[in-house]
């Protein structure tokens, strides 16, 4: 069942919507991480995967305030607010796209 959302996304590959999602968030965060040797994408992935910010901070081995700072930086870069449900869904799609492309699904 875990593969189903990826299957749906795979059918959207190379569409304008797919590329928009990539350019709006994924490409910007990858460029920021490359340029500043940071780990915003990893932090975002952990925050989306865990049940709480505390768990996400623990998984990343960072303080909760550092996690909040990074989520703020993600918002600054992408204009997507982790704490807003529709934006969080958009961010989740980006992480799924990243995983798909990284694993060549």
PLM region spans:
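Cytosolic nucleotide-utilizing catalytic cores of signal-transduction proteins
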Residues: 1-105
């Amino acid at each position: 069942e875990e593969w189903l959302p990826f299957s749906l996304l795979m059918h959207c590959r190379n569409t304008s919507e797919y590329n928009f999602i990539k350019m709006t968030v994924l490409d910007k965060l990858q460029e920021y991480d490359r340029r500043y040797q940071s780990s915003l994408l990893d932090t975002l992935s952990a925050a989306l995967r865990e049940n709480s910010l505390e768990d996400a901070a623990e998984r990343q081995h960072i303080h909760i305030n550092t996690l909040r700072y990074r989520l703020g930086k993600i918002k600054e870069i992408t204009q997507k607010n982790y704490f807003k449900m529709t934006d969080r869904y958009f961010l989740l799609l980006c992480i799924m796209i990243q995983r798909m492309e990284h694993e060549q699904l």
